[in-house]
Amino acid sequence: MHCLSVFVILLLLTASAPSVDAQPKTEDDVPLSSFHDDLQRTVRTLLDIRMCCLGTSGCCPWG
């Protein structure tokens, strides 16, 4: 029974260890920061359009 508890503890420790990406990066890989930047740019653009629609007549792209 003692061996089982040691095995479970070792299993939990190895499961929580940081994993290493064994595959080399290719040129198709896009860093996550790029997606984050795209999201921020999209939100900023939508907010700019919203403020433009509220402040100026004829500025809103959808009428």
UniProtKB/Swiss-Prot annotation:
GO molecular function annotation: toxin activity
The domain of life for this entry's organism is Eukaryota
Q: In which tissues is it expressed?
A: Expressed by the venom duct.
> What are the GO cellular component annotations?
extracellular region
PTM annotation (Tryptophan amide): residues: 62
Q: Which residues form the signal peptide?
A: 1-22
UniProt keywords, alphabetically: Amidation, Disulfide bond, Neurotoxin, Secreted, Signal, Toxin
- The answer, when asked if Disulfide bond is one of the entry's keywords, is yes
Q: Pfam families annotated for this entry?
A: Chi-conotoxin
Q: Which family does it belong to?
A: Belongs to the conotoxin T superfamily.
UniProt xrefs under InterPro entries: T-conotoxin
What modifications does the entry list under PTM / processing? Answer: Contains 2 disulfide bonds that can be either 'C1-C3, C2-C4' or 'C1-C4, C2-C3', since these disulfide connectivities have been observed for conotoxins with cysteine framework V (for examples, see AC P0DQQ7 and AC P81755).
- Domain statement: The cysteine framework is V (CC-CC).
State its location(s). Secreted
This protein is called Conotoxin PnMRCL-0111
Provide the residue ranges of the propeptide in this protein.
23-50
**Lineage of the organism:** Eukaryota, Metazoa, Spiralia, Lophotrochozoa, Mollusca
